[in-house]
Amino acid sequence: MNIALLGLAIPICIADLNAFVIPNIYNKILFYVALTHMAYAGFSQFTQYGISLIILVALFLLRTGMGDLKLLGLILVTHSFSAVEYMAHVLVFALVHFMVITAIHRTIPSKIALAPSIFIALGTYLATGW
């Protein structure tokens, strides 16, 4: 699963940075890879799914993009780490991204591309082993 995420990270980030949209084709590819991964590796704990669902619904109510939610959902379902800790990583990197864009353009952006923050947070979270 991590190889598929690594292979699609750059195209997803480029698409999200250019148009603020993650094309569904990338999420479909990741969905089929995740389905295959889960068929072989099995399902993780169901409490993890419940926590992930609560986080995703909260993000939906905060008007986060659907492509970002699909990507986060696939990552949270296929990895057996703490969803709350991972989302804290995503929040930190999204805030840094927001501050950098604000400093460069000298205006507060109305929206930001979240995919780079998602992938950087995943990489650092997996690398540090929290």
Language-model-detected regions and their locations in the chain:
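A membrane-topology feature that recognizes alpha-helical transmembrane segments
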Residues: M1-W130
